[in-house]
């Protein structure tokens, strides 16, 4: 089954050309099936790139997906054209006002990890989003800073600044092979990482409500399950394109910022050579498993989501 996207959203043509099954809203309306309603709260500056990355993953499942783009109400993006935001996004306050519900919500990261959470300009509204998910979303997936922010809000799990940026592709261990979110995962998983902060395993372990599903000896916890809040928190970037780390590295080199060559990414650690994507299959497994678990457990009646 396809993902439903507006015909003029850039991701529509990009994913169609990649072989992802994409359907227009008009065509979707003729099918006698309830699609899964998945929202993307996009906090990233380059919103189109992020839309494409997540739409590519959730659009590859056998289920029909109604993909909804959401942004913070008062934060104005300087890196995405206003007409794109006006055409394809709704402000969270508009979504909240309608009372509508979602089978799933992805909350992205944001390049603001150096700030204490409470100093983020839209923190108050974001905490309102977190509370709203408990009555209006069946399953929430917090990604990188978005996951850290959720874990701080619900559990006061600290984020800690690193002396050096964790940057590259790091080996991770599958700690719970029987988890429905890790079906088909290898025991050893390579995952892109790009962050200046970390959460620490001993502090995660001190919170009984959190279960670590994937972790690395080098860069710590990667994927946590928070059953009580129907949430997953992933601190690394399964969704990254093949060249995302390269783009970040090249950007920092050009701007003169101190940056190391991303670990275990370029062949022979040579930035002049094209990187090889060795995480794509696990990215599809993770988000496909998440979508499948939502499908298996959500209410058929969307309005009943959030009921005890």
From Swiss-Prot:
Database matches in CDD domains: GATase1_HTS
Gene Ontology MF terms in the entry: homoserine O-acetyltransferase activity; homoserine O-succinyltransferase activity
Any Gene Ontology CC annotation: cytoplasm
Site (Important for acyl-CoA specificity): 113
Enzyme class, broadest EC rank: transferase
Keyword set, alphabetical order: Acyltransferase, Amino-acid biosynthesis, Cytoplasm, Methionine biosynthesis, Transferase
Catalytic reactions on record: L-homoserine + acetyl-CoA = O-acetyl-L-homoserine + CoA
Example GO biological process: L-methionine biosynthetic process from homoserine via O-succinyl-L-homoserine and cystathionine
Matches recorded under InterPro entries: Class_I_gatase-like, HST_MetA, MetA_family
Record's subcellular location: Cytoplasm
Disulfide bonds: none
Annotated catalytic residues: 144, 237, 239
UniProt site (Important for substrate specificity): 194
Biochemical pathway: Amino-acid biosynthesis; L-methionine biosynthesis via de novo pathway; O-acetyl-L-homoserine from L-homoserine: step 1/1
EC identifiers of the protein: 2.3.1.31
Function: Transfers an acetyl group from acetyl-CoA to L-homoserine, forming acetyl-L-homoserine.
Stored PANTHER family: HOMOSERINE O-SUCCINYLTRANSFERASE (PTHR20919:SF0)
HAMAP family documented for this protein: MetA_acyltransf
Family as reported in the entry's similarity comment: Belongs to the MetA family.
Protein name in UniProt: Homoserine O-acetyltransferase
Organism this protein belongs to: Paracoccus denitrificans (strain Pd 1222)
Lineage of producing organism: Bacteria, Pseudomonadati, Pseudomonadota, Alphaproteobacteria, Rhodobacterales
